Amino acid sequence: YGVKRETQIVYPKDAAMIGFKLNIRCGSRVIEVGAGSGALTLLFSRLAGPEGQVVSFEKEERHFRNAQKNLDRLGSLKNVSLHQDDVTGYEDEEFDAAFIDVREPWLHMEKVRSLLKAGGLLGTIVPTANQVSDCLRGLQAGFGDIEVMEIMLRYYKINAERLRPQDRMVAHTGYLAFARKIEEIVPPQA
């Protein structure tokens, strides 16, 4: 996208999986916690299309300004609302999907869960296994279908007589966790 970045990047291999696993498509309503430089915001916007909505929050002023510049520079995104704040507002609305890309995503899971519709999808990305463990603890209440993955992508040298992997690859770029909001089943009163 040509995004000027000041934050850790989400690699295309991870971004593609995030869009796929969150099932973001035309008309989707998406919450993003941690806009960073706005690259994923752009992806979510394009996947959701003109009928969709992306509501993005970035608490850090410097990152917010950079994301805003990137979004402005790369065209009119009428389906994006960028807020310099923690996740606030929108309590009376429901979203199809949410993505959290901050240092401690588990601290936002309860709030984000309250904004997801029943069956809504949540994703996170973190760089360390310890953070994955904390995310899993945060997902224990109110989420199911939990998955954790790491995407490895290896390119090959293009030579029909000696097809083999390239000598270098970007291996670990982050751990992705995905889950689905589940509703509590309240037994009927006798």
Regions inferred by a protein language model and the residue ranges of each:
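C-terminal substrate-binding/active-site "lid" region of AdoMet-derived donor-dependent transferases
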Residues: 106-175
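Helix-to-beta-strand junctions that scaffold the AdoMet/dcAdoMet cofactor pocket
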Residues: 48-49, 76, 116-120
